[in-house]
Amino acid sequence: MGFKQKKTNLMLEYIKDVLRYILFSNSDQNAEYDLLLKDDGMIFVPIYPITYVIDEAFYNKIFNVLNLALTPEYTLIRPLTMQVVVLETANLSQERGLFFPMRKGTANRLNETMEQIIQRFYQTGRIPIMDIIDWDFVKAPHAIITGVSGSGKSYYMKVLFQICSIIGNSIAIDPKGSDLARLAHKQGNEDIVIPQFISSGNGEQGIGGKFLQDVIKALKNIESIMYERQSRIYQNSDKVSTDYRELGFKPYFVFIDELAALLTGANKAVKDDFQNTLTRLIVLGREAGIYLILAMQSARAEYVPTIVRDSISLRIQLGRINSENTRFLFPELNEMPMVPMGGKGTGIISIAGDSRYSGIEPIATPTII
């Protein structure tokens, strides 16, 4: 028996020891399952007939028990639903199992210069998030980042904006006229939408209906770009499945910070116009290379329509994690979902649409040195 197999066997025995005292009240039930350890996860194999019920609660209990017990040897990835796999075996009693995705070790925070981050992008075509986690925005379009003050949300928005401004075109919509807008201004980006801070005597100072109308105007301009690109792709491409890259268009990133603040003081008609425009960009923008990155403290339905939230692939929540504040962005979770990394700029992440990622896992956003 080789060293790798010995280590695998020791890990399986350890997992069985952990489950033995917690999973079942009847010790005899520990003989009614087996475990398989794969490169991408673990399979719990019930040996039928069994005297316990397998359901979502049972699946979640196994996850919660092993979540801490396997750290830091493995990082468990919380699936969005119970995962059942079919096994190739001649034994009818063991032809199916519960799959728990996990990765060996833990992902690490990037502490790099912006030049190093950009170099990573040009090597892979994906935006780095951690050393072994990155964002393929073509496969997984649009992003939403939530977190309370002090969570590191604004810092990470600035990091993303710097990256996206180098690899494509970008616009900054910032109702506070704060970090994001100042960064865009410093970089010489003219596509900045901020409120009017100095009163001109017309009552249009600060955030409110007039500012939201300015935002809608900017978004409708981007919508026109989207339709123009779609028209040119349709007219000039012979491919059935294609996108903006075939015609050499750059990706266009729309950053909206503190989205909830945009709606302050606006009437219903203007709010509806904003949300309808936002929805069209989110739903139709992918093929044309239009990508939205939204940030807010909480992704409540009154701020982000359900169709918008469901169409966003990259979801990040930074700061304190509990069942109350995860229910808007991660409604699948009903309790503490995994072992947090701790520290500023940490939280949880899920990337839908990319087969390399299968659920929710811890994140620590990059630190630019």
Give the residues covered by each predicted segment.
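N-terminal, Lys/Arg- and Ser/Thr-rich interaction peptides
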Residues: 1, 30-42, 175-178, 185, ...
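Basic- and hydrophobic-enriched, low-structure N-terminal and domain-boundary segments
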Residues: 1-142
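Generic recognition of flexible, low-complexity loop/linker segments
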Residues: 31-33, 240-244, 280-281
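P-loop NTPase catalytic phosphate-binding loop
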Residues: 44-46, 101-232, 252, 260-320, ...
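Conserved ATP-driven motor cores of ASCE-family P-loop NTPases powering translocation/secretion/packaging/pilus
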Residues: 57-67, 295-369
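Short helix/loop segment immediately N-terminal to the Walker
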Residues: 230-251
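SF2 helicase catalytic motif II
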Residues: 255
